[in-house]
From Swiss-Prot:
GO terms for molecular function: magnesium ion binding; orotate phosphoribosyltransferase activity. GO terms for biological process: 'de novo' UMP biosynthetic process; pyrimidine nucleobase biosynthetic process. SUPFAM superfamilies: PRTase-like. Homodimer. Its EC number is 2.4.2.10. This is Orotate phosphoribosyltransferase. It comes from Streptococcus pneumoniae serotype 4 (strain ATCC BAA-334 / TIGR4). Belongs to the purine/pyrimidine phosphoribosyltransferase family. PyrE subfamily. Coiled coil: none annotated. It catalyses: orotidine 5'-phosphate + diphosphate = orotate + 5-phospho-alpha-D-ribose 1-diphosphate. Orotate binds at S126. It is an enzyme of class 2 (transferase). 5-phospho-alpha-D-ribose 1-diphosphate binds at R96, K100, H102, E122, D123, L124, I125, S126, T127, G128, G129, S130. The keyword S-adenosyl-L-methionine does not apply.
Length: 210
């Protein structure tokens, strides 16, 4: 079993991912979605957590071998980033969604030197907007951001465009396509549900029609 499939299996088993193609969720953006993901749940399961963190370490070594500091996004990327940094014996920092409104007004907490080569850790990629804002903040404060790693991606076309436009490399451990096919294989969804989930990936606005 590949790492992507193994992680997808864990996410389904521990109910970090819910699939309801016939009764969709409503995202904060207002989009009706057949999938809801809460990767914070992974922290409660040592076997899953270890699989993910070891996967991150190997992915970072392969894609970003020159990394000098790990940074987590607040809040979901912080625990994963801290564990990764510990495993790799690297410094750790975290990036706030906005600068503090008191004290020094920091947006990055920790010590990041000018030009230090950074990898940013996120738990989930939907459109990529929030993590790319974190990357921009890190660059403003002098970090040399090599790229982003995440547990899971919805593989939305908008995310592909956003990362391409920003010139930021993205590496994810698992993804939507891997998960939905495994979910059908393992009986979490029907073949009809799989068709709806495939349609959502292609067209988030009109996937329920037809």
């Amino acid at each position: 079993m590949t790492l992507a499939k193994d992680i997808a299996s864990h996410l389904l088993k521990i109910q970090a991912v819910y699939l309801k193609p016939e009764e969709p969720f409503t995202w904060a953006s207002g989009i009706k979605s057949p999938i809801y993901t809460d990767n914070r749940v992974t922290l409660a399961y040592p076997e899953t957590r270890t699989l993910i963190e070891n996967g991150f370490v190997e992915a970072i070594k392969e894609a970003f071998p020159e990394v000098e500091v790990i940074a987590g996004t607040a809040t979901a990327g912080i625990p994963h980033g801290a564990i990764i940094a510990d495993k790799m014996d690297l410094p750790f920092a975290y990036i706030r969604s906005k600068p503090k409104d008191h004290g020094a007004g920091n947006q990055i907490e920790g010590r990041v030197a000018q030009g230090q080569k950074m990898v940013v850790v996120e738990d989930l990629i939907s459109t990529g907007g929030s993590v790319l804002e974190a990357v921009a903040a890190a660059k403003r404060e002098g970090a040399d951001v090599l790229g982003v790693v995440a547990i899971f991606s919805y593989q939305l076309p908008k995310a592909d465009k956003n990362f391409a436009d920003a010139g930021v490399k993205l590496v994810t451990l698992s993804n939507y396509s891997e998960l939905i096919h495994l979910a059908q294989e393992e009986g979490y969804i029907t073949p009809e549900g799989l068709d709806l989930l495939k349609r959502f990936k292609e067209d988030q606005e009109n996937w329920q029609e037809g």
